[in-house]
Amino acid sequence: MANLPNTSHEDTVGTTGHEWDGIRELNNPLPKWWLYVFYATVLFSVVWAVLYPSVPGLRSYFGGTLGYSQRDAVALSLQQAADSQAVYRTKIRDAAVEQVKADPELYQFSVSGGRVVFAENCAGCHQSGGIGTKGYPSLADDDWLWGGTLADIERTLRFGIRSGHEEARVSQMPRFLADGILKQKEIEAVADYVVALSEQKPGNPQAAAIYKDNCAICHGDAGKGNRELGAPNLTDKIWIYGGDRNTLVHTIAQSRNGVMPAWSGRLDDATIKMLAVYVHSLGGGE
């Protein structure tokens, strides 16, 4: 240690005059450019605090000499967006949904706007792109419980399914086991028969008889369903809750009665029509 060379820059830099146990502190000030930048940022922050909202108080805050407000800016931006869309939305509101689809300009506007509305209000259940998930039907295929025309989709959106609205779509599947209509063995036989229907195979004649007496009135003798009643097609292997035997047994025994909200009153007429056009465009529209 004693033989190490002296590398001190004391002769060229100088010290601050402080010394601790023989250790001296060299005086190396910050570069001037760094100091100038620092002073500029301090000055900028002071000017900013004077011009814009900055210092909070107990009940309010200093609003700045410019009177700027982010809330007002957002409100203005939203109003400007609404004003720019007003011409299209008025036309959509006053037209039938079929006319909206027939007009290329309105159709493109509706698909673009409907996509945003769908993401905000519908994708939570039906998933992005309307692909659906267990308990929530796909909107991208050609299998519809209540019909897939523009008018059908608009009505479903407007009034919902079992939503409590006086014009809602309503159907009621019995709880065949819970209500004592069928016994467990009979329900299992019907489930096997439904599996056979979905696979386009002949089912057990005894199970077919039980199906005909209890299920055909809604689903049809051939299991093709009935859109007037919201009864699904049982022959296309498209299932909302699942098509395996155990799931079918549970569905028959305890029933399924999902609910879709009525969007009338939550969304305006133009938005509902835009949403109907978007859903129709997903691939399964009729």
Regions found by a protein language model. Give the residues of each.
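Sequence/structural segment immediately N-terminal to covalent heme-attachment motifs in c-type
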Residues: 106-131, 145-149, 154-159, 199-225, ...
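Extracytoplasmic electron-transfer domains, predominantly the class I c-type cytochrome c fold
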Residues: 134, 140-196, 226-284
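Periplasmic c-type cytochrome electron-transfer domains
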Residues: 2-105, 146-156, 171-194, 264-280
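Short charge-dense sequence patches
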Residues: 64-71, 100-109, 137-144, 201-202, ...
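Short, flexible micro-motifs
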Residues: 25, 48, 117, 133-135, ...
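Secondary-structure transition/capping residues
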Residues: 57, 125, 164, 168, ...
